[in-house]
Amino acid sequence: MTSRLPISQPEHSPSWHAELHLGFARAGERTVLRENRHRGPLRVQKALYPEGEAVCQTIVLHPPSGIAGGDHLAISAEVGEGSHAQLTTPGAGKWYRSGGAEASQRVAFTVGEGATLEWLPQETIVFDGARARMETQVDLAADSRYIGWDILCLGRVAAGERFEKGRFDLFLQVNRDQRPIWIERGGFDGSDPMLISPAGWAGATVCGTLLCAFPEWPMQASALLEACRKIVPADGAQHGLSALPGVLIARYLGNSSEAARLWFAELWTILRPACCGRPAVIPRIWNT
C-alpha cells in the first residue's frame, strides 16, 4: 500500500516537514513492503530484492539532498514477524548552515518477533553553522535481530571547512524486549573544548558507531570479537570494539568518512552471517 499523507506545512514556511513510514511483513518466503506512506520529500521508490525474496531492500530518498534550519524529518519502520528489511541511502546526508532555526531528524524502528532489520545509511555531514538534532530509537522483540550504523562528519573537510559554529545534539537508544541495551546521548557547540580534548574528539572530524544485536550474541561474542579485531580502518584511525551483554559496539574516530564506511562494511561482512543468517551482499547503490 502506497499513499500520500495530507500536507500540513504552512505556506509561508520554506522548511520541509517530512515523514516516511514503512511497514514490512512476511508473506510465505517473501518479505513485502506492505506500507509506504510519506509526506513531503522523504520517500522510497520501490522494494528491491537483490539477494532473493527473503530480504526486502529499500533506499530512502530525500530529494532536496540536504536538511536546512527549520526542517523536521521523521522516518519510521515496522518490521513484522519473521520478515527481513534492509534500509540504506543513496548518498551522504547533509545538514546545512542554519539562520537560527534548529533542524531535526527522528528515526524510530520496531522489529517484531523473529524479524531482522539492517540500517546501513551513508555518512551524515554537518556543515559549519548548522543547528541539528538527530534521534534514533530501535525497539527489538526478544528474538529479533538488528545491525546498524551512523557516521557523523563535522564540517566539509575536503573544502577546508571545520565545524566551528552551530550546535549538534544526538540521541540513540536500542531496547530489547522493552529494556534498554544501549543508550547514548551527546551534544556540543562548534566551540566546545570537547572537540579538541584528548578525552573527546581529539581534533578528529569523523565519528562512527556500529551496533549489532541478536539473540545468540552472548554465545558467539568471543569468536566474533576476535575476527572483527583483525580488521582495522585503512587510515589507521582510532577505533575500538566492545562486547556488552546484549550488543556489540564498534567505534571509529578519525578524519575519513570513506575509511569509516569501508571499515564498518568489512565488519558487517563478518557479523551479518551470525546476526542475520545470510552472507553479506553489498548493496549495489554503494557502488554508484
UniProtKB/Swiss-Prot annotation:
Localization recorded for this chain is: Cytoplasm
Q: Which Pfam families match?
A: UreD (PF01774)
| A GO cellular component entry from the record | cytoplasm
What HAMAP family does its record include? UreD
Q: What does this protein do?
A: Required for maturation of urease via the functional incorporation of the urease nickel metallocenter.
Q: Which GO terms describe its molecular function?
A: nickel cation binding
Q: Which UniProt keywords apply?
A: Chaperone, Cytoplasm, Nickel insertion
Q: Please give the name of this protein.
A: Urease accessory protein UreD
Q: Which superkingdom, per the lineage?
A: Bacteria
Organism of this sequence: Dechloromonas aromatica (strain RCB)
Q: What is its main location?
A: cytoplasm
Which stretches are annotated as coiled coil?
none
Sequence similarity: Belongs to the UreD family.
Task: Specify whether Chaperone is a keyword of the entry.
Answer: yes
What interactions and quaternary structure are annotated? Answer: UreD, UreF and UreG form a complex that acts as a GTP-hydrolysis-dependent molecular chaperone, activating the urease apoprotein by helping to assemble the nickel containing metallocenter of UreC. The UreE protein probably delivers the nickel.
